[in-house]
Swiss-Prot record:
Gene3D superfamilies for the chain: Kelch-type beta propeller
Keywords annotated in UniProt: Carbohydrate metabolism, Isomerase, Kelch repeat, Periplasm, Repeat, Signal
Subunit structure: Homodimer.
Family per record: Belongs to the NanM family.
Entry EC no(s): 5.1.3.24
Domain of life: Bacteria
Membrane-traversing stretches: none
Pfam families: NANM
Function: Converts alpha-N-acetylneuranimic acid (Neu5Ac) to the beta-anomer, accelerating the equilibrium between the alpha- and beta-anomers. Probably facilitates sialidase-negative bacteria to compete successfully for limited amounts of extracellular Neu5Ac, which is likely taken up in the beta-anomer. In addition, the rapid removal of sialic acid from solution might be advantageous to the bacterium to damp down host responses.
Protein name from the UniProt record: N-acetylneuraminate epimerase
Length: 368
């Protein structure tokens, strides 16, 4: 079996000791997806539309190379993973044939050897947007994400309302003014076997599903960090999935980014240190929600975190800062550290740069 790596998995491959942050992305890049296979980084979708690019991190002249365009149309919030030398792309949010925004549950496969895409005859049993994907023992695992029916219905209503501002305000109030459990975010864990292209039930969270969580895995353990508990309301929760002994166990670790939490953060591991950085949220939303205001982020401004946290001795410590707050980029394992590609900053501005975060002796180094 070829080396299998997800967009957020940890790789211990040996890279050059003087590896630098990558060249700027060909276009401002946010809300897309990415993966790394051995020495080559792949990114695409999101603000790049249907475009995909690759970059050989070992090349002397590092540059992004355009690949065949994604055949499924522009997508936000898709996820991707490499398994046995092929890149798999799961779901996302885009336009259907009628031009309506919707959540997809499909799977596409990219073959790097032929630079070609194929849509698989495979559909997840639920929509995939805001979900996370990781690989364990040759299978892709998916959990979290919004409810497909509720999300699609919201955008169908907005489309029918058109420019009627009164109707739009009513739709938004109805959509956001509900309790977290009424959004039915996905708390199931699904597995996808690329050899059969079949989906299976693999378990479920004893707590609740999230959307826009950060995910990272190493060995038999996977961590889901923060994310939305409902539209506009984040959680500071951290969940650990432990596959040790082939018996999946769900654990809840100490919270981080408290009290409001963030979504779209970045996670990785460097020298066995678990890293969580960045993300976006609404300060004060958790207090509003606890005080009975379901539309918890109404009137609040989205803020972007600069914080870098390390998991150490059973708790999170703020151990550094990004040069600017950012969220909704791609996290990749690179050179035994965390590589962040793109993302958005204040005002939702997509960026082209990358950030490299490494840890040694519990000390954080940030390279821009």
């Amino acid at each position: 079996m070829n080396k299998t790596i997800t967009a957020l998995a940890i790789i211990m491959a040996s890279f050059a000791a003087n590896a630098s942050v990558l060249p700027e992305t060909p276009v401002p890049f946010k809300s897309g997806t990415g993966a790394i296979d051995n020495d080559t980084v792949y990114i695409g979708l999101g603000s790049a539309g249907t475009a995909w690019y690759k970059l050989d991190t070992q090349a002397k002249d590092k540059k992004w190379t355009a690949l065949a365009a994604f055949p499924g149309g522009p997508r936000d919030q898709a996820t991707s993973a490499f398994i046995d030398g092929n890149l798999y792309v799961f779901g996302g949010i885009g336009k259907n044939s009628e031009g309506l925004t919707q959540v997809f549950n499909d799977v596409h496969k990219y073959n790097p050897k032929t630079n070609s895409w194929v849509k698989l005859m495979s559909h997840a049993p639920m929509g995939m947007a805001g979900h996370v994907t990781f690989v364990h023992n040759g299978k892709a695992y998916v959990t979290g994400g919004v409810n497909q029916n509720i999300f699609n219905g919201y955008f169908e209503d907005l489309n029918e309302a058109g420019k009627d501002s009164t109707a739009v305000d009513k739709i938004n109030a109805y959509y956001f003014d509900k309790k977290a459990e009424d959004y039915f975010f996905n708390k199931f864990l699904l597995s996808f076997d690329p050899s059969t292209q079949q989906w299976s039930y693999a378990g479920e969270s004893p707590w609740y599903g999230t959307a826009g969580a950060a995910v990272v895995n190493k060995g038999d353990k996977t961590w889901l960090i923060n994310g939305e508990a409902k539209p506009g309301l984040r959680t500071d929760a951290v969940f650990e999935l432990d596959f040790t002994g082939n018996n999946l166990k769900w654990n809840k670790l100490a919270p981080v980014s408290s009290p409001d939490g963030v979504a779209g953060g970045f996670a990785g591991i460097s020298n066995d240190s678990l890293i969580f950085a960045g993300g976006a949220g609404f300060k004060g939303s958790r207090e509003n929600y606890q005080n009975g205001k379901n539309y918890a982020h109404e009137g609040l401004k989205k803020s972007y975190s600069t914080d870098i946290h390390l998991w150490h001795n059973g708790k999170w410590d703020k151990s550094g800062e990004l040069s600017q707050g950012r969220a909704y980029g791609v996290s990749l394992p690179w050179n035994n550290s965390l590589l962040i590609i793109g993302g958005e900053t204040a005002g939702g501005k997509a960026v082209t740069d990358s950030v490299f975060i490494s840890v040694k002796d519990n000390k954080v180094t940030v390279q821009n």
